[in-house]
């Protein structure tokens, strides 16, 4: 004798219902900001594995959180259109440079040598370090080639910024330059504006307020941070500066341009999205 085939235990609650509850903030009695699979399972009277399976099927991840900032620049549309236009259709016979500074780079020296990576083991370093001062890296990224003009300076006042602009101008003599910059105060000092007025071949294009992400040199700053600074050990600011310059030299030997893909309309549509949250937050 044998049992007839059976369908198994009937489904108590479907995945769509689980997800719909997940998208609503937990009741105040729980004192939490978002659901965990165990808490939601207990709340619905089902297993946490069932909750986790529903989340996986629908791509729901309550534990994740991203930050955003509502654009407030009254010139948002014009600035985004201007900068993105330079990236997607740069002017002929001109150079477009993304300019900014990476300030307060710390010269940190580990108290013991780093242990190298081995099969099955990542590189290791001590948590303890000694501080030996800071440096500021000024950089100008050529969007057509990816090459970088850089300079390390002890401070990041308008004096240092203006000196760097003059260095950039010397690096591109007799060329029309379009500089993409953010709204940092030193970039708008009267001394800087006067110098730009006296050099009409150099034009500035400002990113929107809180829109530094539009500046492609920020991508390059992330690269140098990951590849040369974060895991480095620097016994002095002089050593830090030397290694930054070495990275720039190596980068320029193997560089490539960054390709901008989104249009201004796509960016503005996303920036102007209305809030659709239905939670009580």
Regions of interest found by a model, annotated:
Residues 109, 239-281:
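C-terminal domain-tail junction helix/linker
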């Amino acid at each position: 004798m044998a049992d007839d085939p059976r369908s198994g235990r009937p489904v108590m609650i479907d995945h769509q219902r689980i997800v719909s509850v997940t998208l609503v903030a937990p009741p105040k009695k729980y004192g939490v900001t978002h659901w965990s699979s165990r808490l939601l399972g207990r709340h619905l009277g089902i297993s946490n594995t069932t909750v986790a399976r529903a989340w996986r099927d629908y791509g729901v991840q309550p534990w994740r959180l991203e930050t955003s900032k509502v654009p407030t620049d009254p010139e948002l549309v014009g600035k985004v259109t201007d900068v993105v236009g330079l990236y997607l259709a740069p002017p002929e016979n001109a150079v477009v440079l993304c300019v900014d500074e990476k300030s307060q780079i710390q010269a940190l020296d580990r108290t013991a040598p780093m242990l190298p990576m081995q099969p099955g083991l990542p590189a290791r370093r001590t948590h303890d370090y000694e501080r030996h001062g800071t440096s500021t890296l000024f950089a100008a990224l050529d969007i057509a080639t990816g090459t970088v003009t850089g300079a390390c300076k002890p401070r990041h006042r308008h004096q240092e910024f203006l000196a760097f602009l003059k260095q950039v101008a010397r690096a591109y003599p007799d060329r029309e330059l379009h500089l993409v910059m953010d709204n940092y105060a030193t970039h708008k000092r009267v001394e800087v504006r006067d110098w730009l007025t006296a050099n009409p071949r150099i034009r500035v294009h400002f990113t929107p307020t809180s829109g530094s992400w539009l500046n492609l040199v920020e991508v390059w700053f992330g690269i140098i941070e990951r590849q040369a600074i974060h895991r480095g050990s620097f016994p002095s600011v002089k050593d830090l500066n030397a290694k930054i310059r070495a990275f720039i030299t190596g980068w320029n030997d193997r560089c490539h341009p960054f390709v901008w893909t989104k249009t201004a309309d796509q960016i503005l549509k996303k920036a102007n999205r209305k809030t659709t949250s239905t939670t009580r937050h």
